[in-house]
């Protein structure tokens, strides 16, 4: 097993959340903001720095975040789309970083078993292979991006995420139940909280 101390993590939390009508990253779920949950998952994956890229809704997003990253990165270009946030995160990583985990804030229904399987897959291949969630047969976030991919990723623009690059590569896909259920609208958030309330009511 290779140490994961050379791997960083980026949590992308700069979006406008137009369909939600307020910053998704600041919304509360199970007593913590969605961003707090994502930062905690990032900590479980990475032995290196964890950065949160913010934009829309800042500083409220930071104020409501109980889990602090190693660095807050404000993306002044956040209105241009996700690609600028990914570029900001990659550009800020230390020069010795061999790869980064990239997480979103709107996938709280990913099942717990995914995170350990995800990390184990990255470490098994010594961080040399891109690894991503299997979203019904194609690769998507959360994802691990080896440094060799960064020059290509830095050329992305608009709302393009890493998915297009990952699909052109021999990306290892990890089953990720729940990753396809994004929280994008008030109805999604209401459903999510309803599911959680139902689970709690069944507990002894």
Regions picked out by a protein language model, each given a short descriptive name:
Residues 17, 27, 150-151, 190:
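Nucleotide phosphate-binding site architecture
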Residues 28, 109, 144, 182-183:
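Short aromatic/basic micro-patch
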Residues 139-151, 186:
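Conserved nucleotide-sugar donor-binding
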Residues 2-139, 168-177:
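Nucleotide and nucleotide-moiety/phosphate-recognizing core
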């Amino acid at each position: 097993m290779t140490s994961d101390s050379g791997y960083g993590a980026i949590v992308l939390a700069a979006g406008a959340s137009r369909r939600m009508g307020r910053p998704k990253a600041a919304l509360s779920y199970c007593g913590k903001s969605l961003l707090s949950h994502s930062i905690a998952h990032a900590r479980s994956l990475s032995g290196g720095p964890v950065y949160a890229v913010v934009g829309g809704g800042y500083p409220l997003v930071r104020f409501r975040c109980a889990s602090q990253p190693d660095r807050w990165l404000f993306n002044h270009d956040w209105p241009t789309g996700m690609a600028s946030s990914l570029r900001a995160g990659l550009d800020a990583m230390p020069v010795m970083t061999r790869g980064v985990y990239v997480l979103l804030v709107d996938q709280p229904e990913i099942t717990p078993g995914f995170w350990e399987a995800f990390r184990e897959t990255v470490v098994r291949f010594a961080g040399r292979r891109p690894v991503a969630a299997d979203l019904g047969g194609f690769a998507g976030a959360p994802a691990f991006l080896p440094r060799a991919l960064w020059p290509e990723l830095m050329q992305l623009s608009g709302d393009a995420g890493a998915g297009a690059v990952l699909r052109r590569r021999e990306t290892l896909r990890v089953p990720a139940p729940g990753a396809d259920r994004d929280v994008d609208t008030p109805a999604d958030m209401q459903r999510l909280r309803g599911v959680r309330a139902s689970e709690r009511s069944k507990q002894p």
